[in-house]
Amino acid sequence: MGGISIWQLLIIALIVVLLFGTKKLRSLGGDLGGAVKGFKNAMSSEEDKKALEDAEAAKPVQTAQTVQSAQPTQQATEKKPESNKEQA
C-alpha cells in the first residue's frame, strides 16, 4: 500500500532502459565499477605507504647503532701501533 512493489520497480527499470539505452547504461556501470576499483586501490596504497614509513623509521635507529659500534673498533686499531712505538 505505502511501499514500492516489484512491479513498480520493473516499470521504472524499463523506463530507464528506454530513455538511456543499454549501451549508455553499460558504460555508466563500467565507469562506476572503475571508480570503485580506483578507490579501493587508493585506500590499499595509503595503507602500504604507512607501513613503509613505519619500517623506514625503524631502520635509521639500527643503522646509527651499527655506526657507533664500528667507531670504537677503528680507534682501538689505531692506538695499538702507537703503543708499540712508545715501548721500542
From Swiss-Prot:
GO terms for cellular component: TAT protein transport complex. One of its GO terms (molecular function) is protein transmembrane transporter activity. It is a single-pass membrane protein. Residues 46-57, 77-88 have a biased composition (Basic and acidic residues). Residues 43-88 are annotated as: Disordered. It is found in: Cell inner membrane. Part of the twin-arginine translocation (Tat) system that transports large folded proteins containing a characteristic twin-arginine motif in their signal peptide across membranes. TatA could form the protein-conducting channel of the Tat system. It comes from the Bacteria. The gene is tatA. InterPro entries: TatA/B/E (IPR003369), TatA/E (IPR006312). Keywords: Cell inner membrane, Cell membrane, Membrane, Protein transport, Translocation, Transmembrane, Transmembrane helix, Transport. NCBIfam families: PRK02958.1, tatAE. The Tat system comprises two distinct complexes: a TatABC complex, containing multiple copies of TatA, TatB and TatC subunits, and a separate TatA complex, containing only TatA subunits. Substrates initially bind to the TatABC complex, which probably triggers association of the separate TatA complex to form the active translocon. Residues 62-76 have a biased composition (Polar residues). The chain crosses the membrane at residues 1-21. Pfam families: TatA_B_E. It comes from Shewanella oneidensis (strain ATCC 700550 / JCM 31522 / CIP 106686 / LMG 19005 / NCIMB 14063 / MR-1). This is Sec-independent protein translocase protein TatA. Belongs to the TatA/E family. One of its GO terms (biological process) is protein transport by the Tat complex. Its main location: membrane.
